[in-house]
From Swiss-Prot:
Keywords: Cytoplasm, Hydrolase, NAD, Nucleus, Plant defense. This is Disease resistance protein CHS1. Gene3D superfamilies: Helical domain of apoptotic protease-activating factors, P-loop containing nucleotide triphosphate hydrolases, Toll/interleukin-1 receptor homology (TIR) domain. Induction: Stabilized by low temperatures (at protein level). Signal peptide: none annotated. One of its GO terms (molecular function) is NAD+ nucleosidase activity, cyclic ADP-ribose generating. Residues 185-406 form the NB-ARC domain. It is an enzyme of class 3 (hydrolase).
């Protein structure tokens, strides 16, 4: 496969890609234990596909955005061509070191692809090769086999916790070295006042799209979550009010029956625990006000962080401690760009003028700078000039439009990965 994935990987927004061999594997509830730990997961539905076709673009994009792929298989006879084709791409990503693969087998038995191989004999060899490679990868993980032997909930939680530790252990290297992070963290720590347990404190983080609000919040979560008895990172608070009901509704009730993402918070509220709650994507005053007003459900010393694009929303919600994540400074932006374009702190002398131009076109926004730098790395001056000229004509576009432009400039199609 000749495709280059580097510029796509720079724009990652997901953490974990969940792949399933079939419905039995899908029934294992993995997403809850990941999401409550602030790990954003994508559940693939490729297992539903029984006919031969390339992986759909959304699934392929999710795979390129993810750092980890969890492949869950059962002893059922594999009839899903979609799962097998997806597995081929997952293994290729793993071999290129752009993805960590964690196999989870629900039984000791190997996958059986005999019948589906009879229907598509030309694919049989490559499917069996991918399965063999998955077995080899499994040898690295003690929890890959015998999942069904132990209590399902316990084992799933153990695996989710292992993945969480994997992300926390790499948080410093992923985030701390980013340009401007130390400056942001110093200011945010002052607002958090973690040394004080006198009361619940609500903090607001705001800034324009792509400026790095979520990156800052995720790093903060990784750094301080261990200080709290309960913690959760909510990616979407659209239905939070319905999810976290008044405490009397939980008395004598099995908390697992309530929306999974909020179980931890509901239990913490009931037991008056010290909580860290980070709510991303707060987009209206009702949401902000409701979260801020009800923060006192939790024990003194709890911290609630709201993330939004609108400062006025925070003010009107009664949030007194507010931090703006502004665009990167000139030197920070150039340093970040150089890290992705040249794998060093500063631009190569021959490319300094072009690097400054690229940073300006990126609007000093971290997510766009990472995309530009990753796309341009290894290219000659002529290619830089042509790329920047096309991007200059598209100034003012949002990040999704920029992504499409970058894809259009790439002369190889990433869908080749699913057709080998």
């Amino acid at each position: 496969m000749s495709t280059s994935y580097s510029f796509l990987l720079a724009g990652r927004e997901l953490d974990v890609f969940l792949s399933f061999s079939g419905k039995i594997a899908l029934d294992v509830d993995f997403g809850y234990d990941l999401s409550r730990n602030g790990i954003k997961a994508f559940k693939s539905e490729s297992w539903k596909e029984s006919s031969f076709k390339p992986i759909d673009l959304r699934t392929l994009e999710a795979l390129t955005e993810s750092k980890v792929a969890v492949v869950m298989t059962s002893d059922e006879e594999v009839s899903s061509v979609g799962f097998l084709e997806e597995l081929i791409v997952i293994i290729e990503f793993q071999e290129k070191r752009s993805l960590t693969v964690i196999p989870v087998f629900l039984t000791k038995h190997p996958l059986d692809v005999e019948k589906v191989s009879q229907i598509f004999p030309e694919r049989a060899k490559i499917w069996r090769t991918a399965i063999a490679k998955l077995d080899n990868i499994a040898a690295q993980y003690s929890f890959s086999r015998n999942l069904a032997v132990m209590h399902g909930t316990h084992r799933i939680k153990q695996i989710a916790d292992d993945i969480r530790l994997m992300f926390l252990s790499s948080a410093s290297s992923d985030f701390k070295g980013l340009a401007g992070m130390d400056r942001h963290m110093k200011a945010l720590y002052a607002l958090l006042a973690l040394e004080s347990d006198e009361k619940v404190r609500t903090i607001g983080i705001w800034g324009s799209s792509g400026v790095g609000k979520t990156t800052l919040a995720r790093y903060t979560y990784a750094e301080i979550s261990v200080k709290f008895q309960a913690h959760v990172f909510l990616e979407n608070v659209e239905n939070m009010k319905e999810m976290l009901l008044p405490s009397e509704n939980f008395e004598g009730e099995d908390l697992r029956s309530v929306n999974h993402e909020m179980n931890e918070m509901a239990e913490a509220k009931q037991k008056h625990r010290k909580v860290l709650l980070i709510a991303d994507g707060v987009n209206n005053i009702e949401q902000g006000k409701w979260i801020a007003e009800n923060a006192n459900w939790f024990a003194p010393g709890s911290r609630v962080i709201l993330i939004t694009q609108e400062k006025s929303l925070l003010v009107q919600s009664g949030v007194n401690h507010v931090y703006e994540v502004g665009s990167l400074r000139y030197d920070e932006a150039l340093q970040l760009f150089s890290r992705f374009a040249f794998k060093q702190p500063y631009p190569s002398p021959d490319f300094e003028r072009l690097s400054v131009r690229a940073v300006q076109l990126a609007g000093f926004l971290p997510v766009t700078i990472r995309l530009f730098g990753s796309f341009l790395t290894g290219r000659d001056k002529e290619e830089w000039e042509a790329t920047l000229l096309k991007l200059n004509a598209k100034q003012g576009k949002d990040i999704k439009e920029v992504w499409k432009i970058m894809e259009a400039l790439e002369d190889k199609d990433i869908v080749e990965a699913s057709q080998r």
